[in-house]
């Protein structure tokens, strides 16, 4: 129950400071309902029940922290915290009671403070400052590859070999554009968020034909609560796959069998990588833009298709250009799925456990060994741990903070997992097979 503070003495009615309400964690944790949401940032309590609908990052991501301490998430997602705090002022309703710890649910206070000290060290090392030349070169190399695809057809014709080379080049440019839009989407390039948002729309919209707002809505939830059912959209497999160690058993005991999940590591090759981008994402993106009347993103997306067909219809005609588009999407989808899943799918996938930021991210992520190829191939997402801990950090600085992250994890016996690229791919299938077997055992013995 909230406890009123003491007002100042001898002040006029207009100058009196209102007593600050104080709240216990027990009371705050009750406010995690659909229409009643409180959260805590730096011991200050905010009522976000109505404001969630206006939250620029989306109502779901902030709602996932209702009833919790959101301090580390607040710092992770907002580069310009001074600006963002202006929006918090009207939502402020009080403070944590003096006898309440800063961390909720018996979290390790010293570990949390050490992680925050690590973030301060990264700021002092200027690791959140981007190198413009890196991203200019990266954009240039994407545009150059697209130009080489056009040159291949212009100078070599439209035979099978030039067509295959064109598909290969466009697949590379699309995959790399996917990693580049990720940088701008995370506000990790420009100091001003508005420039990140603008270039993000250009890269994901004009260069890829997708939607910035759709991506933000999905991806930020994934970062806020990775591998947590009902909160991370990336583990919502619409009953096609069962993941982790908990969901398969739950499905099995309930007799749920939409598909033969014990064979999911096999049918993954048929309906996972081949269909995610060409079918599922494409339909979802178009549907979302129209349903939300997101005409700006729709215009950017249309500009991609206009440019694509304007470029390739003279070589292949309309149907041939459609075939080219889908071939590129098909191969890009394989690239995207394997890279994104190797960092998360073999890790813990559970219901909410209310862990601190460090443990939440480390339980759900692993790294792939750095190398020139691995860095380029994955868009530096082989440093997935560092990226999840510091999502606004420019990717070219991950390697600088990685040793300090390792040291912190070692201090508190938090598993820091890193593997080679082959083992990353292998563990995706092993994870699916293991989860499928758990489902079968529970299903047969329900």
From Swiss-Prot:
This protein's UniProt keywords: Electron transport, Endoplasmic reticulum, Fatty acid biosynthesis, Fatty acid metabolism, Lipid biosynthesis, Lipid metabolism, Membrane, Oxidoreductase, Transmembrane, Transmembrane helix, Transport
Q: Which CDD domains match?
A: Delta6-FADS-like
**Record's keyword annotation contains Transmembrane:** yes
For this UniProt entry, which segments traverse the membrane? 133-153, 155-175, 266-286, 308-328
GO MF terms, alphabetically ordered: oxidoreductase activity, acting on paired donors, with oxidation of a pair of donors resulting in the reduction of molecular oxygen to two molecules of water
Q: One GO term of the cellular component aspect? A: endoplasmic reticulum membrane
Q: Which PROSITE patterns match?
A: CYTOCHROME_B5_2
Q: Kindly report, in one word, the top-level EC class recorded for this enzyme.
A: oxidoreductase
Domain (Cytochrome b5 heme-binding): give its ranges: 20-97
Which Pfam families does this entry report, sorted A to Z?
A: Cyt-b5, FA_desaturase
Q: Where is this motif: Histidine box-1?
A: 182-186
Which pathway does it take part in?
A: Lipid metabolism; polyunsaturated fatty acid biosynthesis
Q: How does it sit in the membrane?
A: Multi-pass membrane protein
Question: Where are the Cytoplasmic topological domains?
Answer: 1-132, 176-265, 329-446
Q: Where is this motif: Histidine box-3?
A: 384-388
Give the top-rank taxon of the lineage listed in the UniProt record for this protein.
Eukaryota
Q: Where in the cell is it found?
A: Endoplasmic reticulum membrane
Q: Biological process GO terms, please?
A: lipid metabolic process; unsaturated fatty acid biosynthetic process
**The EC number(s) this enzyme carries:** 1.14.19.-
Q: What does this protein do?
A: Component of a lipid metabolic pathway that catalyzes biosynthesis of highly unsaturated fatty acids (HUFA) from precursor essential polyunsaturated fatty acids (PUFA) linoleic acid (LA) (18:2n-6) and alpha-linolenic acid (ALA) (18:3n-3). Catalyzes the first and rate limiting step in this pathway which is the desaturation of LA (18:2n-6) and ALA (18:3n-3) into gamma-linoleic acid (GLA) (18:3n-6) and stearidonic acid (18:4n-3) respectively and other desaturation steps. Highly unsaturated fatty acids (HUFA) play pivotal roles in many biological functions.
Q: What is known of its domains?
A: The histidine box domains may contain the active site and/or be involved in metal ion binding.
Query: What is the protein's given name?
Result: Fatty acid desaturase 2
Say which species the protein is native to.
Xenopus laevis
Q: What is the lineage of its organism?
A: Eukaryota, Metazoa, Chordata, Craniata, Vertebrata
Task: Give me the gene this protein comes from.
Answer: fads2
